[in-house]
Amino acid sequence: MAALQLSWKARSDLVSVGEYTRRNWGEAQAIRYLDKIQDCMDRLAENPMLGRACDEILPGRRRMEEGRHVIFYRIEKRRIMISRILHQSMLPQGRVQ
């Protein structure tokens, strides 16, 4: 299993997702949704190739959808680097590093 590392932008994205969900659908739903995103990232750590390649956005990047969000990541030697967690309506160009 590869180690997971989140960029500071990905951490900020998670906080924003949690705050938005909490504000609009309540605490319990925010916890459930953030747990689903964490489960998805854990699956990526187990099998990094689950996500699709998205070289058109940035070479070497992959993406995995969870709910209405997309997790962008790259596979490194011993870790999975999560670069962003964006809502599906957000264009990733210029946001994913």
Per-range role (PLM):
Residues 3-61:
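Basic, Lys/Arg-enriched alpha-helical interface segments
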Residues 1-4, 24, 72-74, 79:
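Non-catalytic interaction surface on structured domains
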Residues 69-70, 74-97:
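Enriched for short, Lys/Arg-rich terminal
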Residues 58, 68-69:
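A generic local structural motif
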Residues 1-6, 90-92:
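Short, well-structured N-terminal submotif of metal-dependent ribonuclease cores
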Residues 62-66:
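Short acidic-hydrophobic surface loop/beta-edge motif
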